[in-house]
UniProtKB/Swiss-Prot annotation:
Component of the eukaryotic translation initiation factor 3 (eIF-3) complex. This is Eukaryotic translation initiation factor 3 subunit B. The lineage of its organism: Eukaryota, Fungi, Dikarya, Ascomycota, Pezizomycotina. RNA-binding component of the eukaryotic translation initiation factor 3 (eIF-3) complex, which is involved in protein synthesis of a specialized repertoire of mRNAs and, together with other initiation factors, stimulates binding of mRNA and methionyl-tRNAi to the 40S ribosome. The eIF-3 complex specifically targets and initiates translation of a subset of mRNAs involved in cell proliferation. Keywords: Cytoplasm, Initiation factor, Protein biosynthesis, Repeat, RNA-binding, WD repeat. One of its GO terms (cellular component) is multi-eIF complex. Residues 1-10 have a biased composition (Polar residues). Belongs to the eIF-3 subunit B family. It comes from Aspergillus oryzae (strain ATCC 42149 / RIB 40) (Yellow koji mold). One of its GO terms (molecular function) is RNA binding.
């Protein structure tokens, strides 16, 4: 019988216990875990070779850098020496945790120790893993040089001979990129199913198209839109590019879970929500846990809603700095590309609610050193008033402050060139029963940064927008709407422009106010001058008003001292409109109705800057329309002035080209009709020839088809023979299918 548990006696069981003693607890206590023990060690190469008496001095100097990324001590640094009592140029360092060792490798590798020495930092486990016997061939083999493969031109679309613009169209499960052909059907460049799972997004200069997937973000580019880069961030939901397309920020509400051996992500990213990436290398620079913002007022016992802070990181105009805010406490400014905290500390600002970088590098009057400007605001805390301030970076110097009282909310609006920053202040009365808005406009480039106050507004401002590259702005105000009102409250649209006073812009004055509107959105042309004021996301009003701020007609008497001549060019209606997008040249405007908002009459319409509707494109399950941005012009200011000066001459050429294009289109229609007619004539000729052959075969006269000849023709005699034509018709009355077993 085969031995089994059932056949063993009680004595046998006790004998087995006496023979084998369980040492598992002792083994677990005293076993040396080689893999875990070495995870905290790093190897630093590239150190100066110094004598024994200078070794401790070098270690202390090295500790300044080592402790900037983790915690270690002088005893945890081993720097070996040779027979001549000289150091070997490398050292072993032990950190408290493996995470600190990983951070040291990422942040210290490649950093200069002094002018002559650059650190090379690696994990000790990596050296053991890749340098052990058998991993490296003893015999040198020259590397194989891959044949040169020319990369795609990532800005090839700019060389289009007709200077057309491209756009991305997301509908149903397909994403396509098309050329804009004005009122003609758009020309397809590429169209792919399941190209993205959430949305698509162009980079700021139009070089890349980003698609979002559960696995991460992919960047596409070139004439064929081939894959350029990929950034693995599981369940990514939001994407943000830096202004110069050098960096990328990704966010997910789910903390990242990094699997062992991941080719890109390390344990440093584990548990984080945000990753800042280097686009060129495709590697993460640093990862962070996201900070939620305080939500709005909560009714009853409901849990407070968390609001996502996005963009979580905001970039300076030159990409040298990126900052994030811990609401109510501080602003952390990081230097790129190392992502080190500027000055090794965050800027402590009690109560800070929001901040914004200047969108351009500003040169202030009387200030010669380089700086980036950052504006922020804090609410009223106790007896301290609310405060708006401008901070210079990297010095962290406060260059201007402004105290505010009875403040409910503040919004910061920078002009595109950094010339002005408008602080929109919503104030409540002392009884807190009524609200009003006033504007505090900082003139950043002027000496001392003077502040101009616009306090003529009686109602609350719900939207504000600066003119790009200009000094004018548009705002929308509304009175207090009764709670629960089903009808949109009436709004007023106000246009402001500076006075004409010498070389510098004068004070801002009201040009005109248009009352009894329902408008709630402002869309400036990227080139300035033209603006669309619209009603979006409404169930009852869908107006788009096209305005010209520099109308060339006669100017109203009361507006002659202002740098504006306002004229309504046209009002159009687009049912269910949800989004409005200007093309980067300011020539065309697209209004669209997305299925993400509602499912009624989805699609997109294209208009000229003056409001003429060129084409309507009803599209089932339409989701997103995005124009492809253009990089900044390479022309100097003088060359741009020359182009504007000769614009009328260029316009004649463009008119000729447009006329030629219309003629070509008409010629194409005529040619198509001629081709179809010629094909029909050729077919008719062939049929007549076949009929003539058949008549000849049967002895039928050529003119037998003529009605008169057919009537007068003699009857066919018997001796001429008869032709009998039989027609067999088969009809299935019933059909049965029987299986014979």
């Amino acid at each position: 019988m085969a031995p089994s548990f059932d056949t063993l006696s009680e004595q046998d069981l006790h004998e087995e216990e006496e023979e084998e003693i369980d040492f598992s607890d002792l083994k677990e206590q005293f076993e040396v875990k080689l893999e875990e023990g070495l995870d905290t060690f790093i190897v630093i190469d590239g150190l100066p070779i110094v004598p024994e008496e200078s070794r401790q001095k070098l270690i202390k100097f090295l500790l300044r850098k080592l402790n900037a990324v983790g915690h270690t001590s002088e005893d945890a640094v081993f720097m070996p020496t040779n027979d001549k009592n000289m150091s070997e140029g490398f050292a072993f360092v032990e950190y408290e945790t493996p995470e600190q060792a990983i951070a040291a490798v990422k942040q210290l590798h490649g950093t200069p120790l002094d002018k002559k020495h650059t650190l090379a930092v690696n994990k000790l486990m990596d050296i053991d893993r890749y340098g052990r016997e058998g991993r490296i061939d003893e015999e040198y083999k020259p590397p194989t040089v891959e044949p040169f493969k020319e990369k795609e031109h990532l800005r090839s679309w700019l060389s289009d001979p007709n200077a057309r613009d491209q756009f991305a169209l997301y509908r149903n499960d397909k994403v396509g990129v098309f050329w804009n052909n004005k009122n003609n059907p758009p020309e397809n460049v590429v169209d792919r199913a399941h190209w993205t799972q959430l949305f698509v997004q162009w980079s700021p200069k139009g070089t890349y198209l980003a698609s979002v997937h559960p696995q991460g973000v992919q960047l596409w580019g070139g004439p064929a839109f081939s894959k350029q880069k990929q950034f693995p961030h599981p369940f990514v939901q939001l994407v943000e590019f830096s202004p110069g397309e050098s960096y990328l920020t990704t966010w997910s509400s789910r903390p990242i879970q990094v699997e062992e051996g991941h080719p890109v992500l390390s344990f440093e990213e584990d548990g984080k929500n945000i990753i800042v990436w280097d686009i060129v290398s495709g590697k993460p620079l640093r990862s962070f846990v996201s900070h939620d913002l305080a939500g709005g007022p909560v009714e009853g016992d409901a849990a407070p809603k968390k609001k996502v802070q996005w963009p979580a990181f905001k970039w300076s105009a030159d990409e040298k700095y990126v900052a994030r805010m811990l609401q109510g406490q501080s602003i952390s400014i990081y230097e790129l590309p190392r992502m080190n905290l500027l000055g090794k500390t965050s800027v402590k600002i009690d109560g800070v609610m929001d901040f914004e970088w200047s969108p351009a590098t500003v040169t202030r009057d009387g200030v010669k050193q380089y700086e980036q400007l950052l504006s922020f605001w804090t609410p009223e805390i106790g007896s301290n008033p609310a405060r708006v301030a401008l901070m210079s970076v990297p010095s962290k110097e406060i260059v201007r402050t402004r105290n505010l009282f009875n403040v409910s909310d503040v919004k910061l609006h920078w002009q595109s060139q950094g010339t002005y920053v408008c602080v929109k202040v919503d104030r409540h009365s002392k009884s807190k029963k009524s609200m009003a808005t006033n504007l505090e406009i900082f003139r950043v480039r002027e000496k001392g940064v003077p502040v101009e106050v616009v306090d003529s507004l009686k109602d609350t401002v719900i939207n504000f927008a600066w003119e790009p590259n200009g000094g004018r702005f548009v705002l929308i105000t509304t009175g207090e709407a009764p709670s629960g009102a089903a009808v949109l409250p009436k709004t007023s649209v106000s246009f402001f422009a500076p006075e004409k006073k010498g070389p510098q812009a004068g004070n801002f004055k009201l040009v005109r106010t248009i009352e009894k509107k329902t408008s709630n959105a402002i869309y400036w042309s990227p080139k300035g001058r033209f603006v669309v004021v619209a009603t979006v996301h409404s169930q009852s009003n869908f107006d788009l008003d096209f305005w010209d701020m520099d109308f060339e007609g006669e100017k109203a008497e009361g507006e002659k001292d202002l740098a504006a001549n306002l004229q309504l060019m046209k009002t159009v209606e687009h049912y269910g409109v949800t989004d409005i997008d200007w093309d980067p040249t300011g020539r065309y405007v697209v209004s669209s109705a997305s299925v993400w908002t509602h499912s009624m009459e989805n699609g997109w319409n294209i208009h000229t800057f003056a409001g003429q509707t060129l084409a309507e494109h009803p599209t089932d399950k339409f989701k997103q329309f995005v124009w492809r941005p253009r990089p900044p012009t390479l022309l100097s200011k003088e060359e741009q002035k020359q182009v504007r000066k000769n614009l009328r001459e260029y316009s004649k050429e463009f008119d000729e080209e447009d006329k030629y294009a219309v003629d070509i289109a008409n010629t194409a229609v005529v040619e198509t009709r001629k081709r179809v007619l010629n094909e029909w004539v050729a077919w008719l000729r062939r049929e007549k020839e076949l009929m003539a052959e058949e008549k000849d075969a049967y002895g039928i006269p050529e003119d037998a088809d003529d009605a008169k000849v057919a009537k007068d023709a003699p009857p066919v005699s018997e001796d001429q023979g008869e032709a009998v034509v039989e027609e067999i018709v088969e009809e299935i009355v019933e059909e049965n299918e029987e299986v014979i077993g």
